[in-house]
């Protein structure tokens, strides 16, 4: 948003320097992005008067002039324009002037006659691209005065970054309010005077709002017998300061008022209207040629202003050529309206029309200020274009908005901003912001923001206003007074990170999948009624919420194998979902789980070791390592009955009666279903939510024993259905000297009975306090052998 300092000074007294004003604007939230000092290109450009007028002696097309510029002697200047005469007041660029485009004025000789300057046109001064002749000034223009001073071009333009919640600041009066509030000054609003005729507007035109959802207020006035012409210099100066080119006095006034009050408006040629005006939705494929010369077809019911025959404007966005103001216009209809912001935003983007009008309307206007804006525009049009203002105003007001009422507690405000402001201090700040105050007692007040501040709806908004105007620089920085107590990180948040770190140490790669899986998996994996189905799934592949990570990890393996990546060990940590059923009112439970899947061969890329296929014990080892690192030791393994797993190579992990996980080789039929050939898959899933209560947070450390270990190997024959893990736990309970037992071989085959299996293990014995004697070792081994024989019917292999 461009703001002219000269224009701003019309509404508020400003004594501060440019830098001080820029800093103040930034501190109150209207950030200054750039400052443009205008008139720099108009040094040595002054007002002069033609005091002698002769033809050039050597050219019929040139004139030889003497021009009084306030010096001791008139300047001799040669001119090629045709629109000047004796005694005209003109704009003179003296020797040394540098005009826009780096055009330097020097002493020159034209057709053997010297010239000491140049008479300027608007194009040569950079005001327009083309001009028909030089600038002719009014008779009262003071000779010798700098042209930029005369035209009020000694201006400073601030470019501001206005936030979307402050559309009121897209105007000079809006910024004047902000500056006045900051410096505790008053805003000087424009004086408005209108002389009306006896003739009523109701005899000329009527207005009907057909689409009341998108147009909440529409006002109109008629001015007859206007004279459309070039705008006066003061008006052109204001329009140019905003980066626009003047068009004519009527259009320029509508733009002037928009930049003054931030209220877009439009003027129609009344004689080009056919009947009355209706605000309605566009008809299917209705056509309109807009002011930018583009033929547009309206297909989506855009809101339009229409007469009885045609659309004459796209409401709040752009006018139509069929009713535009031109030099022949005599009677005009002036509109100002409130269109809903969401409608303007939608229309502007659909049609690709981004005008100043649309930019403002889509941010929301002050609907209660329309009558004031209309009066201001009509009074200015009558001033610069003459004409007769018809009596009465068309004002169709569909719905008056309800202003917010905010209860403000002084104690809470002071606590928030870190100050101890009094009731009167806060009241003064808010009053300068046009916020109405009603005391409620006990340090509380009821606040009603002005109609142009729709962004103020709650106490926090008021806190911001008080801080802005009190000044951020006036609030001292303080170190918060607080007691800091160290605390432990919540294990619920810490758990996934710990598990992720452990599995990455083991060389597993993490994957992330969607929480939704296809509906057919319900039958494939025998999920039963525990599945939660999505009523409106994005696709068939995302129809149910997964109760297990199994499907996702299998598809990860399949997709990698299809890309010739077969040696894989993956894991995923994510939530699963389970329906508790009708007994629990259809409630669902979420469990955090970790899934692990192995495929192919272990990557031992060493010269002295060959790759080996992953097996049941690799997976079991990963789980044991994970549980050990989590300090979970009191768990047991039992045979798993699950159709998704190989019946002879799967187990479930239990702590007491809680099943915290399952693992094993996936059933070959399931693997084949996914088109995975010649590969065994090993899958494990741990319920981390259940596991949480068994994790030991505190770890006890002990020193490494300085006494030597004793290693004994043992091979035994057992019944095939005996779980070796349970047997090892029982042995450790009986023999305190056992430090570790490792299984290094399991065999079942032709060399032993078909109902038997051979298990070979290494047993490490150690005492922490002394060296073991032969008697200690023999006693321990005999106890182990007796337990294996008596309880598990085992035999020692020799």
From Swiss-Prot:
Cofactor: Mg(2+)
Annotated cofactor note: Binds 2 magnesium ions per tetramer.
Amino-acid positions noted as binding Mg(2+) in the UniProt annotation, renumbered to this chain: 455, 461, 464-465
GO molecular function, one term: ATP binding
Entry keyword set: Aminoacyl-tRNA synthetase, ATP-binding, Cytoplasm, Ligase, Magnesium, Metal-binding, Nucleotide-binding, Protein biosynthesis, RNA-binding, tRNA-binding
Domain B5: 401-477
Gene3D superfamilies on file: 3.30.56.10, Bira Bifunctional Protein, Domain 2, Ferrodoxin-fold anticodon-binding domain, Nucleic acid-binding proteins, Phenylalanyl-trna Synthetase, Chain B, domain 3
Any single GO BP term: phenylalanyl-tRNA aminoacylation
Domain FDX-ACB: 705-797
Domain of life according to the entry: Bacteria
EC number(s) reported in the record: 6.1.1.20
Main subcellular localisation: cytoplasm
This protein's record includes keyword Thylakoid: no
Catalytic reaction(s) noted: tRNA(Phe) + L-phenylalanine + ATP = L-phenylalanyl-tRNA(Phe) + AMP + diphosphate + H(+)
tRNA-binding domain residues: 39-148
PANTHER family membership: PHENYLALANINE--TRNA LIGASE BETA SUBUNIT (PTHR10947:SF0), PHENYLALANYL-TRNA SYNTHETASE BETA CHAIN AND LEUCINE-RICH REPEAT-CONTAINING PROTEIN 47 (PTHR10947)
Self-association and partners: Tetramer of two alpha and two beta subunits.
Record-linked HAMAP family: Phe_tRNA_synth_beta1
Family listed: Belongs to the phenylalanyl-tRNA synthetase beta subunit family. Type 1 subfamily.
Protein name: Phenylalanine--tRNA ligase beta subunit
Gene name of the encoded protein: pheT
